[in-house]
Amino acid sequence: MTSFAALGDSITLGVGDPVRPARLAGPAVAAGPAVVAGQSPGRGWRGWAALLAEGLNEPGLHILAVNGACMADVERDQLPRALQLRPDIASVVVGVNDTLRGNFDPDRFAAAAGHTVGALRAAGAEVLTMRLPDPGRMLGVPGVLARPLARRARQLNLVMDTVAERFGTLHFDAAGDAETYDPRMWAADRLHPSERGHRLIARRYHGLLAAAGYQVGPPPNAEPTSRPPTRLAELTWLATKGTAWVLRRSTDLVPGLLAMAVTEWRSGRGHGLPPDGDTEWRPGPGHDPRPDVDLAGERWPG
């Protein structure tokens, strides 16, 4: 049996890919539901991790992801549970919530990411990681707010690139994948993948695992099996749940982004995004994205 532990946030929970629980057939779920409770009676979320698990060899799927999780939450709460499972494969897909927080700190993110991925690799797991797309671009926010979000996304992606290189993860570049920005890939909130988007993520990881020599079955189908929401349904969501989400975030995120925008304007950076190579992040003292010592007590090279 191939044991798969899925760590992360609502993307890994499957938000945006609603199904009725009876429709999900495939991997045995040893910890955590493969269909997570959804927003309406009798419905839940499936998502890319469950879709990917269907193509693995006799999979045992452990969904440890938690809605709203940041990287520090994954390190503190999900990593210990994952290490107890000693999975063959583990995914660490998280970061969007970090970019949307007023207390954003790339150094703390780097330390937590390095410890989490390093510990899983030291325990023998193949680790799946991701470069995340720019949330400001997906949300379509005004440029004055989009620029700080873009910088945050690039900083976190640099961290994950560094972590992926040092620990040898299977790293999916969702930020650079042209299909990522197809509107059909996104749910009404524009922060979570639609069923089509979850299928894209599952297919990309399926390809990476196959290239790494894993015995995998056929890749998940690219085409959705459920009818996509109507434009009316999307507008209804945005006018009800979406508005509530914005109001909850406005006391935390928006003031912070506005302050960043003012700072950028004063420094002359507020008229465009940095070039791709200008991420403006270097690890601070004590925040190199790797643990000093692995689980066997040996220092990591570097």
Language-model segment annotations:
Residues 1-67, 79-86, 294-296, 301:
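Serine-esterase "nucleophile elbow" of acetyl-processing enzymes
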Residues 113-117, 157:
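Generic structural signal for well-ordered alpha-helices
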Residues 122-127:
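A short helix->loop->beta-strand "cap" motif at the edges of active sites that frequently abuts
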Residues 137-174, 195:
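Substrate-gating cap/lid alpha-helix
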